[in-house]
């Protein structure tokens, strides 16, 4: 901590699941600790704690002192970048359903932190190793970034997309 005392851990019903280091040779060295809830019903609640190099130690950043809630998108991206299973779910990134919603159109369903996403892509599979970790690139999301889902009473049968400059436009 900034006052020189040792960090006591995530506390409040959370346990550290993993740690990732960034930066090298004393330049911009940062440690990110990911903590998951101990509650059975809340295993998908993840907090991130940021530590910055301070001499030979790492000091907890004030803005993450109580932990920063991690979204499904952030967790998937962090796992892909780190090439590791950071939340202890035995999956590298997004867990892609074995059966495509529409393989020909390129629509799949995936899960991250208990949230279901529709994902546009080709031949998507769950990453079986860190180097194959998949993030939520191609996910269908609402304007606020939350997972898009069809209205109650409807289901998705296929994906039809127009591509302009390799961007889905419709």
Which ranges hold each PLM region?
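Long, low-complexity, Gly/Thr
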Residues: 1-170
